[in-house]
Amino acid sequence: MDLTNPVISLCMKGSRAEFEGRQEDARNLYWQAWELAKDDYDACIAAHYVARFQIEPEDIFRWNQAALTHADKVQEDSAKEFYPSLYLNMGRSYELLGNHTEAKRFYDLAARLGFEHQAE
């Protein structure tokens, strides 16, 4: 991961703000990252973080789906490391929407990559 990439830098700052309890700062930093995204790799990362601050299940789904769609368009392997998290988030999105069949499918995809879903 290129830590000099401005989108990644903004998302890291957003994560730091989020973990420090500065939710509004985190939200703003993630939106800045989304607005700054120049390619599918950047958009994948930014959408992944923007999804975290959505309230409605449909919006959570839409942003998680955008992250996965952008990851699928990245030509090189740079987005490969994000797939387990993207699949888990898609599983959770489908779960929130009541589509347990699709949720399980995405949880299974994540599990094949070595990440198990932990029920809440």
List the model feature ranges, each with a label.
Residues 10, 44-47, 87:
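TPR repeat positional signature
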Residues 8-25:
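Alpha-helical segment of the N-proximal tetratricopeptide repeat
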Residues 1, 33-40, 71-80, 116-117:
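Flexible helix-coil transition and linker loops at the boundaries of alpha-helical arrays
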Residues 44-80:
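Helix-adjacent hinge/juxtasegments
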